[in-house]
Amino acid sequence: MSLSALETSINTAFDARDTVSTATKGEVRDAVEHALDMLDKGEARVAERGDDGKWTVNQWLKKAVLLSFRLNDMSTISGGPGGATWWDKVPSKFSGWGENRFRDAGFRAVPGAIVRRSAFIAKNVVLMPSFVNLGAYVDEATMVDTWVTVGSCAQIGKRVHISGGVGIGGVLEPLQAGPVIIEDDCFIGARSEVAEGVIVRRGAVLSMGVFLGASTKIIDRDSGEIFVGEVPEYSVVVPGNLPGRPLKNGQPGPSTACAVIVKRVDERTRSKTSINELLRD
């Protein structure tokens, strides 16, 4: 089946998704399985970056992921602690893998790392005990540290460091138009959250505890410029707050959380400066 035919088949099935069930056979099931297999191998991805820096979301692939929940019945999934099993519709990416398969894949997955089928993990990635949801893409030489969650269909670039306890939001629950995108060479500080389709551009640094959603204001401290939904490249970002409106009784109102760009660094400066130094200002 050609790529265009695959896309058409999945779009048509999604429009009639109320008729799709675990009993569905034939073209629809084959198309969804093919799409998930492409995602799993990194042959396709939910979002792609163009030469102009703009990201295009392949909505049909996201639809394939959603359709898989209607097609797949619940079943036992092996790999739990002490030989225990889980009960779910999405198998483990590592189901049936042996030493040769792991060596060919070229990444490390320490005990406690969970990756669902249709997520792609590139070579030289390190997965500490973490969770990578279906449809996600984690590119080469990225560190996914302990207790990180990489949400459904999230796109993580090369040489990214995602620190302990970070949450990268997904697109499926609640349903989002576009995935969270972390471009190459970014650093996401511990316990930060990036959700609701926010794009973190190349080389940006988020300090510990930065929370970014689609409506979060990201304010450049030097220029006063306000960004929403996107962190500019090579920005160093820390948590902040905006003063609230006065209450009706005249007293100061509650402040509103925001994020603050405290400085910008170019690639040359970044190569000579440690992450910790960038965060000190």
From Swiss-Prot:
It catalyses: (S)-2,3,4,5-tetrahydrodipicolinate + succinyl-CoA + H2O = (S)-2-succinylamino-6-oxoheptanedioate + CoA. Signal peptide: none annotated. Disulfide bonds: none annotated. Pathway: Amino-acid biosynthesis; L-lysine biosynthesis via DAP pathway; LL-2,6-diaminopimelate from (S)-tetrahydrodipicolinate (succinylase route): step 1/3. Gene3D superfamilies: Hexapeptide repeat proteins (2.160.10.10), Tetrahydrodipicolinate-N-succinyltransferase, N-terminal domain (1.10.166.10). Its EC number is 2.3.1.117. GO terms for biological process: diaminopimelate biosynthetic process; lysine biosynthetic process via diaminopimelate. GO terms for molecular function: 2,3,4,5-tetrahydropyridine-2,6-dicarboxylate N-succinyltransferase activity; nucleotidyltransferase activity. Substrate binds at residues 108, 145. Pfam families: Hexapep_2 (PF14602), THDPS_N_2 (PF14805). It is found in: Cytoplasm. One of its GO terms (cellular component) is cytoplasm. SUPFAM superfamilies: Trimeric LpxA-like enzymes. Keywords: Acyltransferase, Amino-acid biosynthesis, Cytoplasm, Diaminopimelate biosynthesis, Lysine biosynthesis, Repeat, Transferase. Homotrimer. Belongs to the transferase hexapeptide repeat family. This is 2,3,4,5-tetrahydropyridine-2,6-dicarboxylate N-succinyltransferase. It comes from Rhodopseudomonas palustris (strain BisB18). The lineage of its organism: Bacteria, Pseudomonadati, Pseudomonadota, Alphaproteobacteria, Hyphomicrobiales. The gene is dapD.
